[in-house]
Amino acid sequence: NELFADVPEALSNTLEILDKVEYYSIDHAPIMPTFAIPEDFGTEEGYRQKYTEKDLFDEFTQDENGKVVLDEEAAKAKIKRLGGYEKLYRIKLEADYLAKLAFDGAKRIYGDPLSDEVKERLVFELYIMKTMGFPGYFLIVQDFINAARTQLGVSVGPGRGSAAGSAVAYCLGITKIDPIQYDLLFERFLNPDRISLPDIDVDFDDDGRGEVLRWVTEKYGQEKVAHIITYGTMATKLAIKDVARVQKLPLSESDRLAKLVPDKIPDKKLNLPNAIAYVPELQAAEASPDPLVRDTLKYAKMLEGNVRGTGVHACGTIICRDDITDWVPVSTADDKETGEKMLVTQYEGSVIEDTGLIKMDFLGLKTLSIIKEAVENVRLHRGLALDIDKISINDPATYKLYCDGRTIGTFQFESAGMQKYLRELQPGTFEDLIAMNALYRPGPMDYIPDFIDRKWGRKP
């Protein structure tokens, strides 16, 4: 009251606003965008006439072999989580169409008839996708990847992360890596015991990424597609410099204070209070006879960690069933790639999944642009039309380059440390490269010498 004695309405207005605030949850079940399924395959109305709620109850609460796996209470909870019977008709329609596309793709890849191993893998994965409520997600991803390849002439990466463990993704053309051949685990990607939205990172060539985003925006509608905001916060040194500038503290003194902050503090989180406790010179500055110095540290401690500015997530894009503004607050920003105005969610990435909005990751990869340019140069100068996905992975001359460590420009194989280990490993198979790529990470890196010794029989 004393602080705001001259403007008492500031307090009364604040209390009035507080009284009007109502609690509500932003959490929501996944809001899956609607994928346009050909009417000659089926419609929701047709499925309502064809299937009863009992049919859906059985299909969504039994395993892929028709065995009951949920008690009645758990089954009802699952159906409620998926959106009730009204939503189940849509999910079943999408799941059936997804199964058709997956089996059609499998027959093109593996031949017809399919082996029992392939059929069992596809049936299992499709069951998980359906009963988790995500078939529409895979239909959308395969659609824009197919458009990138066949309509837009954009290069698409062969696969990244856990999605490469899905045989359905492989048969749909989302990935180009056979998870059955390489014994990759589907459960790392989708697991009914760990309910979370699927997350497929898709690589496009740098120049083509904007074209794909434009295609997606045109297909689903500008009001239904948005990028994701990022919030930049004040780090310790930046907080000191920002406050010092407002305080009109001399630049030399501002730099001196900022440089006193260590890069890390043993066994403690790096923040200004801990830095002051750790550095005697900062303690002296906090007790300085100069009020500008004292106030700089005082206000920097208050502001440290607060939001300083906003940006746009490098690759995350939301595709919504409805207008984005029906679900989250948005702003606009200029899209650097398309030059057009774009919607940007005001919830950051860590919150978006809780709202039920579906995030797709569109990554621009310079390596793909280089490969695309190289293929075009081969066509122009040699008259050869190369399909990069059909080049043999058993070419001796290529392995010779890896053995010599000549991998500059090769994605994830170009660092000096990787080149050193490649020269020691002398890889001769694709599996050797897989192992080296998996091992060259902070956790297992110490085991690389043992792996190399065992390859060459120097260790049992």
How would you label these PLM feature ranges?
Residues N1-P460:
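Alpha-helical scaffold/interaction cores of sigma-54-like transcription cofactors
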